[in-house]
Each structure stands twice: as C-alpha cells, then as structure tokens.
Amino acid sequence: MNAGGKRYCVITPYFKEDKAMLTRCMDSVARQTVPVEHILVADGFPQDWIATKPVRHIVLDRAHSDFGNLGRGIGAMMAVAEQYSGIAFLDADNWYDDDHIECCLAALQQNPRSIFAAAQRRFVRPNGTPMPTIKPAELPHHEHIDTNCYFFLPRSYYLLHHWCTMPRELSESGDHLFYLLMYHTVPQPAVVGKPTVNYLCMIDEIYRQLGEEPPPGAKSTLDWRDRQRWLNSLPQEDLNLVKLLTGLDFQRLPAA
C-alpha cells in the first residue's frame, strides 16, 4: 500500500497455526495506522481461506523445519524485488499494536543514520493477558533483537538473503545470528521507545519465575551448546561455507 509515496509490507511465514491465531495476526497488520501490505508464506501447509482475505499468499510445497526462516526470507526477497520502502516481520502467533509501523518509522526519522529499526516486545500469555513484570532480553537493555521486532529500510536489504541461506542446523538461533550480522555490518538500529509487539510467551522458565504453571507446549530457553557441537563437528571447508551462508565467522569452541 502507498503512504505518502511509500510502500511498506509485513512478512508472515506460517506452518500449522490455527485460523484464530492467524486471524489475530492478520487483523493486527490490517489495523496499522500506516497502511501496509501483508505477505503470508505457507511453509508446506497452506490454508485455503487465506485466499479470501486482502493479503498476498505464497505457498511453499513442503515444510522446511527451519522455524520459518526460508518462508521469511522468500517473502523478504519478493518484497525487495518489488521495491517496497520498508519490510517488517511478524510470526503467525504474534500480533502488533496498531501503531507498530508508525513507531518504527518515527524512530528511524529521529535516527537518520540507522537503516533498520528495532521494536520492543511485551510478553503475553496464551489467553492474551500481558506479563508486565517481564522485560525481554533485547535492545535497548540487552544485545538481541527478536525476529518480530525488525523493520528494514532499503539500505539494509542486501543482507536479507541470509534468512534463506542460513543452515537449518542453526535456524533456531536465527534471530540472534541475524542480529550479530547486523551488529557487525551496519550502523546501530533506531530503537522504538515502547513495546509495540505482542509476543506469545511459551518459555517455561518465565512462567516459573512468575510462580505460574507453564502452558501446554511451553519449552525451555534456547541452549546454544547443541549448535556449537554441530559447528565443532564440521571440517574446515564446511565451516568456511557456513561463514559464507550466514555472514558470520564461526569458530570451533568448547560446547560445554
């Protein structure tokens, strides 16, 4: 969609999320105070009802077991080719505040050297209630940006292909690896001053920290050691290839 001559889009890869969850995600994009187009990418399990909605729908013929990275990257590459003025990501289980895109653009306007924005999250329970005492470990407090919090300007587009080329064995850490790539490659992001991303919290430890029973399906926080063991197992030639595919210079390090 056009906003003052600019066109923005949101990319959402999806897998087997139910209709209610996808609808919540899609409705939040449709409500943005700055008009945006929404591109959904089915990772092997397309839902036909989406074709009746005012969104774009890309279908991958099989699932890729990479936490949505390929779908995210393919959607982004299409948006780059179609010359959108800004690209954001939103996973199917999360949703935006109505002013999310507006706040990202405002942060970038205030920080003209930045070529991408970092939004902030609020953690929410499966019933939609917020977890206000939890401060996600991300900018401006910690060195991390969640996938749902990226907003890219065209000068950063040349890095987006790494979502497609990142090895599947590293995909669970994709958002942090991409953050490290951006950190070492481009100026620091414009940080949005308030949370505008509603993040469905399925992290076991956070519920226990609050004295609550974790919901069904909750998982422990990510442990890098499994990925480091995989890196350590690679011959140097393959480790060099991983560097090309990720843009990061991994080393063999103790996994323990």
Regions found by a protein language model. Give the residues of each.
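Catalytic beta-strand/loop signature of glycosyltransferases that borders the donor
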Residues: 120, 189-196
